């Protein structure tokens, strides 16, 4: 929530009335800002995109497979790469970690994709599809003027932004896409602190 307020106040969404933030890193987070103020919901959990369903699996621990966080946060991306390697695919990621699969990070996968590693490109493509699905769900619910994409979607925009845009176009009606600005976040890790300061200042006025 605070990160969304920060981006809406002085970040990518500055001057825009209705903003939705969707960011993915270690976790998947979201936030909805309308008229400069966050929409928090009855329990302060509005915009909790990490719990949105993406995969209709039936598992005892839903947090590990099926929801946005499980599929597209860092651990989920790495898990897909490890699955591919264990299935017999060979990737330059293995060379980067000396075949220690426990050492694989998202950065290894992104770097390999930029170097035209086929397995990494496939993993990134699958990730972008899931990210686009989640983003489309947020847009459908909030109908914002701007969708701000943060975390790896900003740092790896060269790999992810266009596929996410394509997925939005596939999954949403034209009337909902027309006029929707899709931008990458600009405040990085400082967004939450900036947003918290904004809310604290508003509370004392």
Model-derived segments and spans:
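ATP-binding/phosphotransfer module of carbohydrate and carboxylate kinases, centering on a glycine-rich
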Residues: 9-16, 38, 56-205
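Conserved phosphate-binding catalytic cores of ATP/NTP-utilizing and phosphoryl-transfer enzymes
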Residues: 1-21
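Well-ordered beta-strand positions enriched in small/hydrophobic/aromatic, beta-favoring residues
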Residues: 19-22, 52, 182
């Amino acid at each position: 929530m605070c990160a969304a307020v920060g981006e809406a106040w002085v970040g990518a969404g500055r001057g825009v009335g209705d903003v939705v933030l969707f960011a993915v890193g270690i976790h998947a987070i979201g936030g909805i800002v309308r008229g400069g103020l966050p929409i928090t919901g009855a329990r302060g959990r509005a915009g909790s995109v990490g719990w949105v369903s993406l995969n209709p699996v039936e598992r005892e621990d839903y947090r590990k497979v099926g929801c946005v966080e499980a599929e597209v946060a860092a651990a989920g991306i790495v898990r897909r790469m490890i699955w591919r390697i264990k299935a017999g695919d060979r990737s330059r990621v293995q060379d980067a970690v000396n075949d220690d699969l426990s050492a694989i990070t998202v950065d290894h996968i992104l770097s390999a994709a930029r170097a035209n590693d086929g397995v990494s490109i496939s993993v990134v493509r699958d990730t972008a599809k899931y990210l686009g699905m989640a983003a489309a769900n947020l847009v459908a619910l909030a109908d914002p003027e701007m969708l701000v994409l943060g975390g790896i979607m900003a740092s790896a925009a060269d790999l992810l932004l266009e596929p996410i845009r394509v997925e939005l176009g596939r999954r949403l009606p034209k009337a909902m896409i027309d006029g929707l600005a899709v931008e990458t976040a600009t405040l990085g890790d400082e967004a939450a602190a900036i947003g918290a300061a904004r809310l604290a200042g508003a509370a004392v006025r």
